[in-house]
């Protein structure tokens, strides 16, 4: 039974760096541009807000 706990702990430590790979966090202008968005203060009309551009007042906006 101890080997199961050891294996679980090993897998947890081994796979923990991959957690950031699956989430699409947009928090800088480069990642905003990579998804086809632009940094604006307001997202109006048929444009959706996908995240922020690093500064709290700028939003990453992308068309629907």
From Swiss-Prot:
Q: Which InterPro entries match?
A: Defensin_beta-like
Which family would the database say this protein is a member of?
Answer: Belongs to the beta-defensin family.
Identify the species of origin.
Mus musculus (Mouse)
Identify the coding gene: Defb5
Predominant cellular place of this UniProt entry's protein: secreted
Indicate where this protein resides in the cell. Answer: Secreted
Lineage of the organism: Eukaryota, Metazoa, Chordata, Craniata, Vertebrata
According to UniProt, the name of this protein is Beta-defensin 5
An example Gene Ontology cellular component term from the record?
A: extracellular region
Q: Where is the signal peptide?
A: 1-23
Q: Which UniProt keywords apply?
A: Antibiotic, Antimicrobial, Defensin, Disulfide bond, Secreted, Signal
